[in-house]
């Protein structure tokens, strides 16, 4: 359901944009653009080993998700995201998936750290069969240890 935090199998290389898919050598990419080396490295790690991501469900199957002017809209209505810090704005991250209808049997996910999150804005919707679990307790940081709402 919307607002739940889930874990899911991280997308493979094929999920990422065509511009990133052209990369063959992360070292050469480092020499070309040092600012993106860590995101490019993560991209290769995803292809090599199975990892899990943890994100919040934002859009459900059949819903129209749009990101505009720092806000998320579901079917034209602004999404109230009380779980975010008031200063957090949501931008497109120049991702291709910021105005879409969520396909059947998929969800649109986003991280709460919106400015740094690799999520559905970047790699698209997650098939329901890729969901591994629902998060219900937080261990870290210790000052936030407890049940996740």
Map each language-model feature to its residues:
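Extended hydrophobic leader/signal-anchor segments used for secretion and membrane insertion
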Residues: 1-149
């Amino acid at each position: 359901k919307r607002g739940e935090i889930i874990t899911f199998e991280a997308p493979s290389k094929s999920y990422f944009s065509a511009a990133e898919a052209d990369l063959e050598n992360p070292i050469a990419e480092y020499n070309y653009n040092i600012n993106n080396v860590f995101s490019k490295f993560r991209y290769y790690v995803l292809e090599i080993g199975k990892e899990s991501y943890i994100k919040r469900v934002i859009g459900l199957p059949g819903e129209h998700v749009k990101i505009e002017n720092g806000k998320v809209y579901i079917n034209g209505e602004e999404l109230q995201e009380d779980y975010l810090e008031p200063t957090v704005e949501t931008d497109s991250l120049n991702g291709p998936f910021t105005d879409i209808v969520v396909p059947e049997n998929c969800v649109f996910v986003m991280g709460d750290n919106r400015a740094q999150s690799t999520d559905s804005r970047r790699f698209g919707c997650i098939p329901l069969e890729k969901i591994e679990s629902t998060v219900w307790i937080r261990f870290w940081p210790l000052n936030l240890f407890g049940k996740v709402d």
